[in-house]
């Protein structure tokens, strides 16, 4: 059974939205701490880039 590219992108979006909601519920880190938390905007930009690569390879413009 082949998994379509659209279902992979939807699965990635669901996972990222769950992670982003978990991060938004967590308390904010101290300004002096060196935490390397990934912002939800960076994650969504990464998803957009991956989706462009996945669907861009199928499109011939």
UniProtKB/Swiss-Prot annotation:
<protein>
    <recommendedName>
        <fullName>Arabinogalactan protein 15</fullName>
    </recommendedName>
</protein>
<keyword id="KW-1003">Cell membrane</keyword>
<feature type="signal peptide">
    <location>
        <begin position="1"/>
        <end position="22"/>
    </location>
</feature>
<feature type="glycosylation site" description="O-linked (Ara...) hydroxyproline">
    <location>
        <position position="27"/>
    </location>
</feature>
<feature type="glycosylation site" description="O-linked (Ara...) hydroxyproline">
    <location>
        <position position="31"/>
    </location>
</feature>
<keyword id="KW-0325">Glycoprotein</keyword>
<feature type="modified residue" description="Pyrrolidone carboxylic acid">
    <location>
        <position position="23"/>
    </location>
</feature>
<keyword id="KW-0472">Membrane</keyword>
<keyword id="KW-0654">Proteoglycan</keyword>
<dbReference type="GO" id="GO:0005886">
    <property type="term" value="C:plasma membrane"/>
</dbReference>
<keyword id="KW-0379">Hydroxylation</keyword>
<feature type="modified residue" description="4-hydroxyproline">
    <location>
        <position position="31"/>
    </location>
</feature>
<keyword id="KW-0449">Lipoprotein</keyword>
<keyword id="KW-0873">Pyrrolidone carboxylic acid</keyword>
<feature type="modified residue" description="4-hydroxyproline">
    <location>
        <position position="27"/>
    </location>
</feature>
<feature type="propeptide" description="Removed in mature form">
    <location>
        <begin position="36"/>
        <end position="61"/>
    </location>
</feature>
<keyword id="KW-0336">GPI-anchor</keyword>
<feature type="glycosylation site" description="O-linked (Ara...) hydroxyproline">
    <location>
        <position position="29"/>
    </location>
</feature>
<dbReference type="GO" id="GO:0098552">
    <property type="term" value="C:side of membrane"/>
</dbReference>
<comment type="function">
    <text>Proteoglycan that seems to be implicated in diverse developmental roles such as differentiation, cell-cell recognition, embryogenesis and programmed cell death.</text>
</comment>
<feature type="modified residue" description="4-hydroxyproline">
    <location>
        <position position="29"/>
    </location>
</feature>
<comment type="similarity">
    <text>Belongs to the AG-peptide AGP family.</text>
</comment>
<keyword id="KW-0732">Signal</keyword>
<feature type="lipid moiety-binding region" description="GPI-anchor amidated serine">
    <location>
        <position position="35"/>
    </location>
</feature>
């Amino acid at each position: 059974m082949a998994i379509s590219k659209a279902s992979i992108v939807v699965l990635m979006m669901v996972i990222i939205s769950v992670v982003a909601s978990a991060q938004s519920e967590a308390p904010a880190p101290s300004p002096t701490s060196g935490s390397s938390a990934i912002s939800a905007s960076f994650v969504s930009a990464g998803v957009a880039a991956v989706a462009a690569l996945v669907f861009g390879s199928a499109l011939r413009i």
